């Protein structure tokens, strides 16, 4: 059964089981990367957020939710993804920010999604995605691209990995 998201779904309590929601699109500002090596994902995240936060301020935009990565194809040894933040209104045009990073307007897709929360360290995300996609299929739904991760818990050096929450989301066909 599909539920309408009553508040931003990325600010809700953890989704302890696979939940189907109908959601509106959400304006975002992102750095898009194509054919980026999986081994350089942490560098992509670090460079994006080092440039993104100050750039939002200069553009008069406010973040309205946690960081995310949106994947436009299944990853292999490389990934095509957008890394960014949801914002209070769309960015008018691309902006070149710190270190020459181009930030572009985008959005988290609206429509019917499946979502579940992974509670634990990032190194458990691969298994969590496998279980999530299996549960979605077993419930009779067909995952579609894109899919995305929402990093509800902001990582920090003092963070207990067991307390971290990452929401796994896929658009449904």
Please annotate each region the language model reported.
Residues 1-173:
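A solvent-exposed interaction/effector surface
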């Amino acid at each position: 059964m599909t539920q309408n998201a009553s508040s931003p779904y990325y600010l809700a309590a953890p989704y302890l089981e696979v939940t189907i929601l109908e959601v509106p699109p959400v304006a975002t500002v992102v750095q898009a990367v194509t054919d980026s090596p999986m081994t350089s994902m942490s560098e992509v995240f670090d460079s994006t957020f080092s440039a993104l936060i100050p750039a939002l301020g200069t553009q008069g935009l406010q973040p309205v939710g946690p960081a995310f990565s949106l994947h436009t194809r299944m990853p292999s040894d490389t990934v095509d993804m957008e890394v960014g933040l949801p914002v209070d209104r769309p960015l008018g045009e691309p902006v070149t920010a710190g270190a020459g990073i181009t930030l572009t307007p985008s959005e988290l897709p609206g429509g019917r999604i499946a979502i579940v929360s992974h509670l634990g360290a990032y190194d458990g995300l691969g298994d969590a995605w496998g279980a999530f996609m299996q549960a979605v299929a077993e419930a009779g739904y067909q995952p579609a691209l894109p899919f995305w991760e929402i990093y509800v818990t902001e990582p920090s050096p003092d963070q207990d990995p067991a307390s971290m929450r990452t929401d796994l989301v896929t658009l449904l066909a």
